[in-house]
């Protein structure tokens, strides 16, 4: 029996570990990682027609319309859908078994557009909510360091003064202050709760305790997914460590 491609959407507050868990899931389950932020930056840097339209909004300090962001994400999802269909028709073997999306949707309007698409091509899709306390977010973000070259994220407990990959001196984000972080948490809650309520009503929401260590969070996510939908592939668990297991590391994004 053919296994339905796995499609996950990962959501959570700043510092909840979305980036780390997305990398772990993509690596260990052979999922394509789709980041809406990366799609936006790539479109602008490549000066595509859509990128030019996005840049015009950003240059004016305006919020991007739901339909514009959806158009960008939809292009990528359509590529994924076409690839999945091709595999079914021609029995081609590809490394990806599905995809994980982060950074989208941010509004109920976006969620409805996405749901209409996914119900047609990935009907068993799930939303992974990384639920984390305000105190833990504050603790993580005030102790994180970033590589200005590769954008790798490390925490103070790891003891690095330089990026182990680039050998560039690590820096702090200027907005990683308690006051700004608390404001970002409140903004996240106000913007995201309606989206979470929408997905909860569709019975697609899986809530995971993200206060736990990275390794435990990852294992809890796997436990919450139907085993028939994935196969673990032992690879390097994320970009900031070289282990060949799926125990993860202590960095958080």
Curated annotation (Swiss-Prot):
The cross-references to PANTHER family, in alphabetical order and at most eight, read: NUCLEOTIDE KINASE
* Gene responsible for this protein: adk
Region span, LID:
143-176
State the GO CC annotations: cytoplasm
* Protein's UniProt name: Adenylate kinase
| HAMAP family on file | Adenylate_kinase_Adk
Q: Where does AMP bind?
A: 36, 41, 62-64, 103-106, 110, 173, 184
Which reactions are catalysed by this chain? Answer: AMP + ATP = 2 ADP
Which sites bind ATP?
15-20, 144, 153-154, 212
Gene3D superfamilies reported for this sequence: P-loop containing nucleotide triphosphate hydrolases (3.40.50.300)
